[in-house]
From Swiss-Prot:
Its EC number is 3.6.1.-. It comes from the Bacteria. The keyword Amino-acid biosynthesis does not apply. This is RNA pyrophosphohydrolase. It is an enzyme of class 3 (hydrolase). One of its GO terms (cellular component) is cytoplasm. SUPFAM superfamilies: Nudix. The gene is rppH. GO terms for molecular function: metal ion binding; mRNA 5'-diphosphatase activity. Gene3D superfamilies: Nucleoside Triphosphate Pyrophosphohydrolase.
Length: 163
């Protein structure tokens, strides 16, 4: 779904473990890494879209995670001009995202990036909390920085076993 300003409505997912590390996923057939994310369908809430994307991209179900928090506002990034598909109607110029912070409550072995016929990712690993901000593609960097700043206090509490 694309809004009136040309932004595709989307959810982003940060998954953390008990050590405060976050799941970092490798895009299929590329050497490009990112957090799981995906579009919101017309009839879905952001939370419903998040659970659908969680299953489609990582093979995880609602019982495998716990929602710790989400952003209370939409974050946007613009696509570089060479990535915009100008011949589509409506034209999508970027993403408008709600982000969720999840705690993985199941074993790592439940993560399956090849659970669909057209996987988004072909690998994943745990990385330190701030690592993605430095490593994500440049046009997403500001959004990642904002998300991680907002989620930092929750991950700190997990590391201290307070939540």
């Amino acid at each position: 779904m694309i809004d009136n300003d040309g932004y595709r409505l989307n959810v982003g997912i940060v998954i953390c473990n008990k050590k405060g590390q976050v799941l970092w996923a490798k895009r299929y057939g590329q050497y490009s890494w990112q957090f799981p994310q995906g579009g919101i369908h017309l009839t879905e809430s952001p939370e419903e879209a998040m659970y659908r994307e969680l299953f489609e991209e990582l093979g995880l179900n609602k019982k495998d995670v716990r929602i710790l928090t989400s952003t209370h506002y939409w974050l946007r990034y613009k696509l570089p001009k060479h990535l915009v598909r100008w011949n589509t109607d409506p034209v999508c110029i970027g993403q408008k995202q709600r982000w969720f912070l999840l705690e993985l409550t199941c074993d790592d072995s439940n993560i399956n990036v090849e659970c669909t016929k057209a996987p988004e990712f072909d690998g994943w690993c745990w990385v330190s909390f701030w690592y993605p901000v430095r490593q994500v593609v440049s046009f997403k960097r500001d959004v990642y920085r904002q998300v991680m700043k907002e989620f930092f206090s929750f991950v700190s509490l997990i590391q201290k076993h307070l939540i």
